[in-house]
Amino acid sequence: MALSSFSQIILPSPGMAALIRKARDELVSNAENGPSEYLSVHIRRGDRLGMTWKYHNTHVPTSLYVDAAVETWQRLNPASDSPLFYVASDSPEAVEDFLDQLPSNVRVTSLGWSSDEELRGIASPRSYVQEEFNTLGEEERIQLTKGMIVDFALLAGFWIKEDDPDARPYATVCGLRYSTALESLCRHVC
């Protein structure tokens, strides 16, 4: 219900819809047998720190994202031997670290690794810190916000029409700021 409400009430502008379409087309081109499902991963760095006792005031280790992504893929798609991950992050270094730790059979795409210059141009060039963002010029803030919206659309599968053959996320691995002693990583099956 919430997904359909969000997707029908909050709509991207035509320009944003074109960027989302371009990113989805590239994602589909990375799928082995045409449109398929993929696992999305969101790694937040910058001023977002962990709140659990284990990772209080530090970033959740990238290795936990890798372990959660691989385990989720194996659990939900045991017959697949070539997983496709979409990785969104405010930190190019976090994406590199994530890629370095993955098994070689995993295919990965992200805005920063796009073959399209316009998509690479909206990828976050550095970890997000709100105070720094507030000091940026308007055009840079607009570009970074566009990247966040495209990442959001691919992470969550928003704005895909029911009959659209696009690749869809079947699960998302992300770090959350829990105030309880729950594990820092969530595995949310969309």
Map each language-model feature to its residues.
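Core catalytic architecture of nucleotide-activated donor-dependent transferases building glycoconjugates
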Residues: 1-132, 139
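Mature hydrolase/peptidase catalytic cores and their serpin-fold inhibitory cores, especially
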Residues: 95, 132-153, 157-158
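A donor-sugar binding/catalytic signature common to diverse glycosyltransferases
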Residues: 146-190
